[in-house]
């Protein structure tokens, strides 16, 4: 089983309001992401919260997700990922995690299906989508890397682990530009969402 982890703990300081709750085509970013993941074969969907946690819990209580809280969210994304890993380590049937960021609302279930399929076919430790020369999200990390991710330097994040396993990384080419769209400012939101 591959569990999905949505990182949504940050302060959204550049956006000025929680990115998870931004509207997009009649739903919020997080609703759109969860709906897409539920169309795939991923197992548990975990959401890691941090900033304004009680308000966020209320806003997403209707979603079919498990909520985890990162009290140290100010340390960065890796700290949130580590909260999820500590939870997933207790689940024996979890082979890997598919990590997605809440400010990337464009997630294609077909791409996720391809990535999960290739993970099991190839035995690679990391599966990452690529649009042109740019890598994007979501990213699959094998359970075998959980220990390394838990001990990775906070200032380098998961990149340190990715860089250490170049030969064990499979890139999946896609024509979906959405994998690289990180919507974290009002300007980017207007450009990529309001104009839909």
Model-derived segments and spans:
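N-terminal glycine-rich phosphate-binding loop and ensuing alpha1 helix
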Residues: 1-57
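Conserved N-terminal catalytic core of the sugar/cofactor nucleotidyltransferase
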Residues: 32-96
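Conserved alpha/beta core of the MobA/IspD/sugar-nucleotide pyrophosphorylase nucleotidyltransferase superfamily
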Residues: 147, 153-196
């Amino acid at each position: 089983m591959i569990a999905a982890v949505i990182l949504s703990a940050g302060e959204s300081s550049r956006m000025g309001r929680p990115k998870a709750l931004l509207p997009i085509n009649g739903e919020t970013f997080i609703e759109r992401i969860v709906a897409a993941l539920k169309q795939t074969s991923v197992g548990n969907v975990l959401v890691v919260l941090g900033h304004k946690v009680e308000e966020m819990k209320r806003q997403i209580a209707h979603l079919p997700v498990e909520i985890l809280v990162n009290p140290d969210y100010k340390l960065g994304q890796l700290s949130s990922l580590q909260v999820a890993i500590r939870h997933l380590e207790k689940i024996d049937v979890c082979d890997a995690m598919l990590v997605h960021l809440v400010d990337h609302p464009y997630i294609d279930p077909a791409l996720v299906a391809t990535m999960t399929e290739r993970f099991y076919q190839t035995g690679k430790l990391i599966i990452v989508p690529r649009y042109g020369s740019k890598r994007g999200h979501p990213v699959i990390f094998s359970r075998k890397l959980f220990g390394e991710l838990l001990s990775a330097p906070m200032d380098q994040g998961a990149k340190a682990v990715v860089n250490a396993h170049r030969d064990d990384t499979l890139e999946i080419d896609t024509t979906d530009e959405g994998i690289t769209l990180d919507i974290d400012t009002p300007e980017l939101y207007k450009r990529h969402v309001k104009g839909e």
